[in-house]
Amino acid sequence: AVVCHLERYTPNGILLRKVDKTYLLGFIDYLKKTKQEHCKKEKTLHVNTQFYYLKTLRYCLNRAVSEDYITVNPMNKIKNEDKPKRNRTERDYLTIKELTRLVHTPFYNILLRKAFLFSCFCGLRHCDIIALRWEDIRYDENGNALLSIIQKKTKEAISLPLCSEAIKHLPDRGNAPETEKVFAGLVSLGRSNVILHKWVEQAGISKHVTFHTARHTHATMMLTL
């Protein structure tokens, strides 16, 4: 998503060594004014999305410094007051309508798509989904699924029933042994969040969505049942 906006900001491209303070200030101004794609109503980018895009660009420039493509990160010359401010008061979650829109929006990263939707319907953290193995999911004589794990973050053991919607978004097991990870190959949390933005934009959702949004979504759905 960041690359798409950089291409729209400078259609003819720019050499890495020519990315300076002026270029970055112009990009910040572009982010403030540009309209969301795939959205019926004309809306500018959410301030949290602007913040995230700039953070991603900073990371890329830091990598360029570490790889000796450039000597300094020009982002360090930008004053904090000139950067988009993250709105920390909001705890975004997906409404049922938005979640349904995501469910019906195809995406090239099928594994991440399944993992995110699975989290929406069961509430597991990204770190627990990455560690999840087929042996952690058991079925009783009635076909009801129960997930039992020790949470990575809290070290607490939990057991929770899996609804049919959660089970629907599990990958196809095939002949995988019980010890194999359910979501084998799922990328890191940071990378997952970068990729999620593309899917959310395709679905026409304007909220700042990260993998953790799935937990908020699940918690909100539980409160409304």
PLM features per residue range, with description:
Residues 1-8, 25-32, 58, 79, ...:
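Amphipathic, well-packed alpha-helical segments that form the structural scaffold of globular domains
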Residues 2-22, 36-77, 125-127, 198:
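N-terminal DNA-binding recognition helix of tyrosine site-specific recombinases/integrases
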Residues 19, 51-52, 186-190, 206-225:
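Short basic/aromatic active-site micro-motif
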Residues 43-47, 51-55, 66, 70-126, ...:
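Basic, Lys/Arg- and aromatic-enriched nucleic-acid-binding interface segment
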Residues 44, 88, 112, 143, ...:
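Exposed loop/turn and edge beta-strand positions of beta-sandwich/beta-sheet ligand-binding modules
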Residues 66, 117, 121, 127-128, ...:
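C-terminal catalytic core of tyrosine-transesterase DNA break-rejoin enzymes
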Residues 77-82, 122, 131-172:
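Conserved tyrosine-mediated DNA breakage-rejoining catalytic core shared by Y-recombinases
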